[in-house]
């Protein structure tokens, strides 16, 4: 009964719909012979036979003599016996969330009366590393690396080896999707940060304070051929350019001595507030292989003015909608790195197909155009083209 309770809990936890009462009500025929498999389905979709599943899927095996189970394995990973329910003609077992030591693409069932196996492929999720939450975190400060499946690959507090060059980062906390770490005091800018987990053959490198290909020179802002609409906002700094010394409400720069743009004002529904328009020069490396690059920049939002579902900002002809998922972007007064693939499409791409490389010019703009009237208090800086991770 304990095993059945565990399975029933697993079903309710993942919202699988199984006719458990019907199964329990059936007379259980004694399993006296070697086990046989006639069909494998997902527990919540008995109609369609499957030959593979994902981690944590609940699998239903149909056949004969499946009672008196001793073990169930996917590849060489054994299912916790407490999570198995077995009877003469049916067996339920979840695919464990664990990397196999050896991939055999087989399901193995052993009972007191014999064993049976059947080809069955378990999809193994890849390690996903999005990068540092703030690629320009100052030495000594803490930040987060986001991604997925860190636990599977041994990126834990105990096992993770994270360093910038030879400087070791202190891992403070680790979950399936995030690592919290402290940047070492002796970390050097423009040095790769490497991550090595206990289940990884090779480390993964991500950029730390890598300037990439800078799009703007804030020491020559708005630049030759560029213009802003700052004249419409007399209370703003000249051309929206700041260095953090302006007073209350102005965040500290991303790094010492850096400048940034701050826009704090209202824009009407479907308005067209041009923060900057002009020409940029796109490096030949980027125009030759745009799919390998991101547009990266750092943002800082006032906690009272997150970027919600109505936010739209044009980068060139690309329409950035950071809150479209329903989760607002709010950095609560800190700086955070944003990344948008140059091959992504939202109305258009960030740089046009067939874009000519520098020294040719490419028309570009930054425009605030929300779908509903909203107040912005957004600071931005460090616009660059950066190579994608991996």
Regions found by a protein language model. Give the residues of each.
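Extracellular/lumenal carbohydrate-interaction signature centered on repeated Trp-anchored short motifs
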Residues: 272-295, 329-332, 355-359
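Beta-strand acidic-aromatic groove motif in beta-rich domains, primarily in extracellular
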Residues: 304-317
């Amino acid at each position: 009964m304990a095993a059945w309770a565990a399975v029933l809990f697993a079903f309710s936890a993942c919202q699988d719909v199984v006719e458990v009462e019907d199964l329990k009500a059936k007379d259980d025929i004694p399993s006296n012979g070697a086990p046989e498999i006639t069909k494998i389905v997902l527990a919540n979709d008995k109609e369609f036979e499957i030959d593979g599943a994902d981690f944590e899927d609940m699998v239903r095996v149909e056949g004969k003599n499946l009672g008196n189970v001793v073990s169930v394995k996917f590849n060489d990973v054994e299912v916790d016996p407490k999570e198995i329910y077995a009877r003469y003609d049916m067996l339920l077992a979840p695919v464990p969330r664990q990397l196999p030591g050896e991939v055999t693409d087989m399901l193995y069932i052993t009972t007191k009366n014999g064993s049976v196996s059947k080809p069955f492929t378990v999809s193994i999720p890849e390690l996903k590393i999005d990068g540092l939450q703030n690629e320009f975190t100052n030495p000594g400060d803490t930040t987060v690396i986001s991604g997925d499946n860190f636990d599977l690959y041994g990126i834990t507090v105990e096992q993770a080896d994270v360093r910038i060059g030879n400087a070791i980062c202190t891992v403070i906390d680790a979950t399936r999707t995030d690592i919290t770490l402290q940047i070492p005091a002796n970390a050097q800018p423009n040095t790769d940060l490497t991550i090595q987990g206990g289940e990884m053959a090779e480390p993964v490198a991500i950029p730390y304070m890598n300037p990439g290909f800078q799009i703007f020179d804030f020491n020559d802002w708005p630049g030759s051929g560029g213009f802003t609409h700052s004249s419409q906002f007399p209370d703003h700094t000249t051309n929206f350019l700041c260095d953090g010394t302006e007073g209350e409400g102005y965040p500290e720069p991303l790094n010492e001595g850096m400048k940034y743009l701050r826009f704090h004002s209202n824009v009407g529904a479907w308005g067209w507030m041009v923060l900057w328009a002009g020409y940029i020069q796109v490096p030949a490396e980027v125009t030759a292989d745009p799919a390998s690059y991101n547009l990266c920049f750092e943002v800082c939002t006032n906690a009272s003015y997150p970027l919600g579902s109505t936010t739209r900002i044009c980068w060139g002809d690309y329409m950035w909608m950071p809150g479209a998922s329903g989760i607002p972007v709010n950095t609560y007064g800190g700086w955070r790195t944003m990344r948008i693939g140059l091959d992504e499409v939202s109305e258009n791409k960030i740089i046009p197909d067939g874009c000519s490389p520098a020294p040719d010019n490419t028309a570009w703009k930054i425009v605030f155009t929300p779908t509903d009237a909203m107040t912005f208090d957004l600071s931005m800086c460090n616009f660059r083209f950066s190579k994608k991770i991996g």
